[in-house]
Amino acid sequence: SCMKGEKYLFVVSGPSGTGKDTVVAKLLGSHPEIEKTVSATTRTMREGEVNGKNYHFLTKEQFETALAEGNIVEHTCYCENYYGTLRSEVERHMEQQIPVILVIEVEGAGNIKRMSPGSTTIFVMPPDMKELERRLRYRGTEAEEVIQKRLRRAETEIARSADYDEHVVNDVVDTCAEEIYSIIQKRIAEPDAE
């Protein structure tokens, strides 16, 4: 059953290297009425970061308590730190009817959809595998085996992308951002679930 306000929830996902963060940043820059969830993390605050703006900074104990109490809707562990989405962050947007984007890994997207069937999942595709490989290499930070692993994972994720409500191809960032914007506009214009 859909909770009221679930139509304001948008999950953007896709393989590593598709540029989903860049596309969402572009979208938020052009359309300030749309927001993005602020993730919770246990990593140390960096200089210039603001608690509650860049991240909600939690201790490992706080994060694990929130997790145990069901107050974190999806999370991942990266470089020995937790990153996750707070339930309160999602619910606030639903209550206030503010369209909100969660940019998350493919594995986390299914969890959100199960929790909020009224949410919209959007899969960001690379133009093709060659381009994805080029983008992963362009970063110049990863070892060859890491790149190969990510490409294999991307193929698996793309193969499973049929489960998503919407698909967009990130060829030109601006175009892709506007495509997502029109998906959001169309969805929030639909009548509320009773």
Predicted regions and their residues:
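Conserved glycine(s) of the Walker
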Residues: 14, 19
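N-terminal phosphate/diphosphate-binding loop that engages ATP/GTP or pyrophosphate donors
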Residues: 21-71
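Flexible beta-alpha connector loops of hexameric P-loop NTPases
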Residues: 73-80, 138-145
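NTP-dependent small-molecule kinase module
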Residues: 118, 134, 138-142, 156-194
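Short hydrophobic/aromatic beta-strand immediately N-terminal to the Walker A/P-loop
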Residues: 9-11
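ATP-dependent NMP and nucleoside kinases share a basic, alpha-helical "lid"
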Residues: 61-71, 85-140, 184
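Hydrophobic/aromatic beta-strand patches that form the interior of the parallel beta-sheet core
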Residues: 37, 56, 120-122, 166-168
